[in-house]
A protein has these predicted regions:
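Anion (oxyanion) recognition and catalysis
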Residues: 26-27, 59
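Ordered, soluble secondary-structure elements with a strong preference for glycine-centered loop motifs
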Residues: 12-16, 41-48
Length: 90
């Protein structure tokens, strides 16, 4: 790895407008832990669209994305891969 540190940031996805700031942080090669509960409680369909958008963005940038239980999603830069066991859901 490079001499630059990789930062870990926890964010809450409250609204579809938060997706752009999450993408900006992902472009900075941060590891992001995104709490999705507030949006899930408001509008599950909008949450699905937001997650699909983030999934496509992260994959096209060479990063990785996975669920962390029911309440969180983790996003990693290209240099960090997420181990997904056989029982993990996509």
């Amino acid at each position: 790895l490079q001499n630059q540190p990789i930062y870990l940031k926890a964010i809450t996805l409250k609204d579809i407008s938060d997706v752009d700031s999450i993408k900006d942080d992902a472009k900075k090669h941060m590891i992001l832990i995104v709490r999705i509960t507030p949006m899930a409680q408001k509008d599950i369909e909008t949450l699905r669209k937001a997650i699909d958008d983030l999934y496509n963005f992260v994959k096209s940038a060479g990063g990785d994305i996975a669920r962390l239980g029911e309440e969180r999603v983790v996003i990693t830069p290209p240099a960090v891969k997420i181990w997904k066991g056989v029982h993990d859901l996509k």
